[in-house]
Amino acid sequence: VCEVHLTGTELGEKSYMQSTLVERGAAYKMLLDGTVQAASTHVPALFLHQDLKECLESIQEKTPKLLQSAQNTKFALDNVRPESSLQNLVSKFCIEPDEIKKSGINFIAAIGSERGWTDAERVLLAEKGFTLCSMGKRVLRTETAATVSASIILSSLGFLD
């Protein structure tokens, strides 16, 4: 995980972006704790955004090629109107783990709040080239969805063998 972008969503709890998780640095502390637990030295960069549009515009402005590159895989978890399962999307990349780094492929995940995306947010994600993917019909907490999706990607690419 290179970057984490926390953003407000249309259906998300409005007070979330003003919570202690965000305002007092608790989110960054969680990233540090996760880095220690993983026995890693890499701490993902943390960015805060008021809404999804601002988030995507910020990423586009900072690293235009990230959202434009066809070799990058962009997906948004959505159990309402998925186009594919996350497993099926990732399974298209049947290359060795060492080749992933050399190829420059990035997986860009958009994980919404427990209440999901609005139709307007789905349209915005589609306009930016995101594929709506499911991990089943059940609603997962955001942090659980993030962990599970990362695990599916890593396992599918052979990083957990």
Residue ranges and their predicted role:
Residues 19-22, 89-92, 123-125, 148:
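Short, glycine/charged-enriched secondary-structure capping and boundary segments
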Residues 16, 86-87, 119-122:
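Short glycine-/acidic-enriched loop or helix-start segments at secondary-structure transitions
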Residues 50-100, 105-107, 111:
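A mid-sequence, solvent-exposed acidic-amphipathic segment
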Residues 80-83, 114-118, 139-140:
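Short Gly/Pro-enriched loop/turn and capping motifs at secondary-structure junctions
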Residues 1-75:
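RNA substrate-binding interface of SAM-dependent RNA methyltransferases
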Residues 104-124:
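A C-terminal functional module that forms or caps the active site or interfaces directly
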Residues 119-161:
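Structured adenosyl-cofactor binding patch, chiefly the S-adenosyl-L-methionine
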